[in-house]
Amino acid sequence: MDFSIFRYLIVGAGFFGSVLAERIANDRDEPVLVIEKRDHIGGNCYSQVDPETEIEYHRYGTHIFHTSKQKVWEYINRFTSFNGYRHQVLASYQNRVYQMPINLETINSFFGLNLRPFEVGDFLKSEVEKENITNPKSLEDKAVSLVGRKLYEAFIKGYTIKQWQKDPRELPASIIQRLPVRKNYDENYYFDQWQGIPSSGYSEIFKKMLNHRKIEFHLKTDFFVIKPYIPKSCHVIYSCC
């Protein structure tokens, strides 16, 4: 491979690397080489079709696109359309189902109350004051100091143990700075104006981004193997973990 013809080398063909390559190729009209260690483009957003069911799925877990920036939304829609999906989450506790993140409906249903939006703040304050935690030492202390013991035990403790595989009392308080509590009935997980999942899948986005006469990309290529052959005149942009 002749690296001397490329002004830019981008390591990683995920969102950051692919967008940057597309921008350099179109805005600067300069040659870009994109390399990817995996056998596919798209990074952790890679999607593929299951041959048995013919259903497209996200190999590394579901990714929901969301933004409130019009410029970003207009840009990404050059490469795909979206299905309008808005993420909503439900949590089960003691055979009852509640909306998450915690909102006014969650609080009223859980405590059997009929609070109005302007009353939520004082109610949570009263729950927090029952524990009198002024200097949180652990994640558990911090969470209880934010939402009170009952909401913590019902909706945060179990999920935290599952996520970290540790008792929340053994985790530092610094892990969380705040817990989202909505003082209204908004049940959407994200606040952003534009949300959805690409109608043709994420992989199609990256194919279109990298389909440019100034862009060349190679899969199954390890940066550290080719590093000694890269000329100093080439700008290297490393976008991998």
Task: Describe each model-derived feature in a short phrase.
Residues 1-4:
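A short, basic/flexible loop-to-alpha-helix module at the beginning of a structural domain
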Residues 6, 17, 216-218, 235-240:
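Long, positively charged, glycine-interspersed low-complexity recognition regions
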Residues 6-34:
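N-terminal Rossmann-like FAD-binding beta1-loop-alpha1 element of flavoenzymes
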Residues 9-11, 35, 232-241:
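Short hydrophobic core segments
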Residues 25-51:
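Glycine-rich FAD pyrophosphate-binding loop
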Residues 31, 56, 81, 216-218:
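Conserved beta-strand segments of alpha/beta enzyme cores
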Residues 53-129:
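Dinucleotide-binding Rossmann-like beta1-alpha1 core, especially the glycine-rich loop
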Residues 96-98, 105-234:
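Active-site/ligand-binding neighborhood in enzyme catalytic cores
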